[in-house]
UniProtKB/Swiss-Prot annotation:
The keyword DNA-binding applies. It comes from Alcelaphine herpesvirus 1 (strain C500) (AlHV-1). The active site is at E320, D474, E546, D658. Its EC number is 3.1.-.-. Pfam families: DNA_pack_C, DNA_pack_N. Interacts with the terminase subunits TRM1 and TRM2. Interacts with portal protein. InterPro entries: DNA_pack_C (IPR003498), DNA_pack_C_sf (IPR038435), DNA_pack_N (IPR003499), HSV_TRM3 (IPR033663), P-loop_NTPase (IPR027417). This is Tripartite terminase subunit 3. HAMAP family: HSV_TRM3.
Length: 686
């Protein structure tokens, strides 16, 4: 019975002794006089609070810095905090031999005469260091790190023996911004100290500044512990840092309610309920320790954006930000104007839908806000899509969290329910059609194409110019200038392999009057007539009219051109699969990818040239037709499809690729000798 009565007192006394031992163990005592005193000019020496006055160059000594961190660490192995012990792993400290210790003591056995100025300078350094160590802000920030460390060390969950790298990065983005607003004058000193706590002491200042930015974005695959770590961070912030205002916004009400409840349960586990004021009607938690200003958490959803208006959050966590209601984004982004506020966007990435993967557009931004967890690098995305048994990038050392199951069977089973869902939910930044990120045509080839043009009017060149040219027409039957236009190009053969662009048009209908076929045919005929006038050796033209948009209009265009052409013309004829009837049109299919590859090959080898006398009636006189074409050539992108095939296009926001398609297809079809080019059959059937 006596043992039972005194047990609580014994435990309390034991904890006090452990705290005292923890506070003193491994710490150097501050000497009354400097151990070392270099009597040089004040500008050439450096006062160290534990060693004395050292040469100024010692401030840049990494050896001295490592020595001090090893033998006088800021945090020892069994540091106590409100939530238990941190269990920090401490490096083994080398021990000096007895003989060496005796010799070193002899060096300092002689009395040293230290000047009064040196003593005053040393004492000032000691006071500054002690004031920094005991400042309220430093103790709060230190308490947060220690409490979070103890909390995540199997106090939060049995599985939380360690955290993932992205979770540590999320903690650092939160913490170092907090340092920058809580102690702006001492921010650099505090950051240098706390870098040791996170084991990033070798990180340079430019990289560390990224953590202090006012916005950060995390794209993490599903089921990896995003909300889990956010709840831990918010809970420990409320318990450790006073006068802090935190906001949490979720895409659904049940998610916000779950986080709200989990934070309450976490705080109740370690602290009495009297420290906490919960207001369920507006999702607010107010937590305050005795004699400290309370901190506040507000949990809201994107559907109730008015609840976050007028708030002064210093940290705003936006969970599943890709799926946030777009009407709420302006309200959320309004906190960027607040000087001491940071927005942290956290989301999984359903990259099969552009509307729910808009945050990935931040990739490549100079602010370096985007953080992505992916199992496949950009160079191997196509391999990942084409090989069913591949679950991660071959150039990665696969690290899978202990609570995640990823293998070939999981991938196969998941894709059975919905094709491609494993890729889009796991890879984070992939899409159902992946665009190549490298330049397809070299810059030197583009410069050569623009500058080195052929004088096709000279007799020497005309002697080698083939008498037959090829024209390709990609018609568009719309007056929407932003959507699409008609692309027309004329290409001639120079010698055995070289192709020369003699003329090109990018024609847009001004009005829809029912005469689109006639207007397109007139544009093509005018182009052909001008090319023939400049190059009188051209005697025949092979014409291909694309009929994917309207087969009837394509046939009409062929009839108009046949009646008005200045030279004999033949047309590509497509066979009707059911009746076998030949029609003067061309249906563009999967050969488009092959045609683009042929064009890319010709451009990179310099086998595709432009004429100095290139003809164009529709491209503005102030705009060089070759430069106009090059804008589309530079925008060529290779898109990988799910079936393993790929296609090419050069569509841009303010410019269509009609002219480029006509040039590509004209070059491709002019290279074949067995295509069905025939005169137009004009015999009447009635």
């Amino acid at each position: 019975m006596f043992y039972v009565k005194v047990m609580p007192a014994l435990q309390k006394a034991c904890e006090e002794l452990q705290n005292q031992w923890s506070a003193k163990s491994g710490k150097w005592p501050v000497p009354e006089t400097p151990l070392v005193a270099v009597e040089t000019r004040r500008s050439e020496r450096w006062p160290h609070p534990y060693l004395g006055l050292l040469p100024g160059v010692a401030a840049y000594s990494s050896t001295l810095e490592d020595y001090c961190h090893l033998y006088n660490p800021y945090i020892d192995a069994l540091t106590r905090c409100d939530l238990g012990q941190t269990h920090r792993r401490v490096a083994t400290q080398p021990v000096l031999s007895d003989q060496l210790c005796q010799q070193l003591k002899k060096l300092f056995s002689c009395p040293r005469n230290t000047s009064v100025k040196a003593k005053l300078e040393f004492e000032a350094a000691v006071r500054t260091h002690q004031a920094l160590d005991n400042s309220q802000v430093f103790l709060e920030l230190k308490t947060f790190v220690l409490n979070l460390s103890a909390f995540l060390n199997k106090r939060y969950s049995d599985r939380s023996s360690h955290i993932e790298l992205f979770q540590k990065q999320l903690i650092m983005h939160t913490f170092f911004f907090l340092v920058s607003i809580k102690a702006p004058e001492l921010c650099e000193k505090f950051c240098n100290i706390f870098k040791l706590y996170f084991n990033i002491d070798t990180m340079d200042q430019a990289t560390l500044d990224i953590f202090k930015q006012k916005a950060s974005v995390f794209l993490i695959p599903r089921r990896h512990g995003k909300t889990w770590i956010v709840v831990a961070i918010i809970s420990i912030l409320l318990a450790s840092v006073q006068d802090l205002r935190i906001g949490y916004v979720a895409h659904q009400k049940h998610v916000a309610n779950a986080v709200f409840t989990e934070v309450i349960n976490t705080l109740h586990t370690f602290f009495p309920g009297k420290y906490m004021d919960v207001k369920k009607e507006n999702g607010t938690i107010i937590f305050g320790l005795p004699n400290k200003k309370p901190s506040t958490l507000l949990c809201a959803t994107c559907f109730n954006k008015n609840s976050i208006r007028g708030q002064t959050f210093q940290l705003l966590f936006v969970d599943e930000a890709n799926f946030i209601k777009k009407d709420a984004l302006p309200t959320i982004l309004g906190f960027m104007l607040q000087k001491d506020a940071k927005i942290i966007f956290i989301s999984s990435s359903n990259s099969s839908d552009q509307s729910t993967s808009f945050l990935y557009n931040l990739k490549g931004a100079s602010e370096r806000m985007l953080n992505v967890v992916s199992y496949v690098c950009s160079n191997h995305k196509e391999d990942f899509s084409m090989q069913d048994g591949l679950i991660s990038c071959p150039c990665y050392s696969l690290h899978v969290p202990s609570y995640i199951s990823i293998d070939e069977q999981i991938k196969t089973t998941t894709n059975l329910f919905l094709d491609g869902v494993f890729d889009t939910e796991l890879m984070g930044d992939s899409s159902c059609g992946t665009l190549s990120t490298f330049q397809i045509i070299s810059e030197s080839a583009l410069s050569q194409f623009e500058l080195c043009r052929i004088d096709t009017a000279s007799p020497q060149v005309q002697a080698h110019l083939n008498s037959t040219v090829h024209m390709y027409i990609d018609p568009a039957f719309t007056n929407n200038l932003d959507a699409s236009g008609t692309g027309i190009s004329v290409i001639g053969r120079l010698g055995a392999k070289t192709k020369v662009i003699l003329g090109c048009e990018h024609f847009f209908l001004q009005k829809l009057t029912g005469t689109a076929a006639l207007q397109i045919a007139s544009c093509a005929t005018s182009l052909l007539r001008s090319v023939v006038i400049i190059h009188p050796m051209i005697k025949c033209a092979q014409i291909t009219i694309e009929g994917n948009s309207s087969q009837d209009s394509a046939v009409a265009i062929a009839n108009f051109i046949d009646e008005c052409a200045p030279i004999p013309v033949t047309f590509y004829h497509q066979s009707d699969k059911t009746k076998g009837v030949l029609c003067p049109l061309y249906l563009l299919g999967q050969e488009k990818a092959v045609a683009f590859e042929s064009f890319i090959y010709a451009m990179n080898l310099g086998l595709c040239k432009a004429s100095q006398l290139i003809v164009s009636h529709t491209i503005k006189l102030s705009f060089d037709p070759v430069t106009y074409l090059l804008e589309q050539v530079r925008a060529i992108k290779c898109q990988s499809l799910r079936d393993g095939s790929h296609t090419y296009h050069a569509k841009q926001k303010n410019l269509s690729d009609d002219l480029l398609v006509s040039v590509v297809m004209s070059l491709y079809l002019s290279s074949a000798n067995t295509l069905p080019f025939k005169p137009l059959h004009i015999e009447r059937f009635f």
